[in-house]
Amino acid sequence: MQDLDWDNVWDEVRQLRKSADFWKQFAAFQPFNGGFSTTTAINGVDLTRYGDGLALFSTVHTRSDGGASQSNASSTGIPFNESNLETGLIAMKEQLLDDGTPIRDLGRISIVVPHNTEKSARIVVGSSLRPSVNNNDINIYNDGMYNVVATHLLASVTGRVGGTSGSDTAWFLVAENLNKLMYVNRLSPTLTT
């Protein structure tokens, strides 16, 4: 009977668990990486899309009441800065529901950025005074209402499944009380012998 090296076996199990956990984190950000197209799989992750058949982030979303189309994306791909944050927030707050009525409560808003933009985002929402002016204006974004979520899983990185993916400049506003992005773990990772 052969003795097993149990330390190595458990180390392999731990590494498999870490790999499975990372894959779940990676998969959770793929709607952002692939949100500007209607491709069904992004970086090896299958995405299910519902609604109007357009990309998740589109400038021409239709409303079910037949009203004017709406945009939840910049048509020019504006970079993150204080001024463009204000532009994005105004656009988000002026969105209408499918019946044409205003959105009543957005809740806390998260600014989701690739790690390359994290410093700028944290300066904009964390400074006590406005970071882009010299007149000591108050910074209206540092009241805790805006949360920064930064991750390397959004950045443009080569060597991922499917090649280079993500963007070093794309940023997103996510309102917690609006329609939530849903992550369904259809088949949890399991270990079998």
Range-by-range predicted roles:
Residues G51-D98, D105-S110, H115-T193:
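Sequence/fold signature of self-assembling virion shell proteins
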Residues M1-T40, I111:
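Long, contiguous amphipathic alpha-helices that act as assembly "spine/axial" helices in icosahedral shell
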Residues K24-G66:
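Glycine-rich, mobile lid/loop segments that gate access to catalytic sites or pores
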Residues D3, L97-G100:
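Catalytic micro-motifs at enzyme active sites that drive phosphoryl/nucleotidyl and oxygen chemistry
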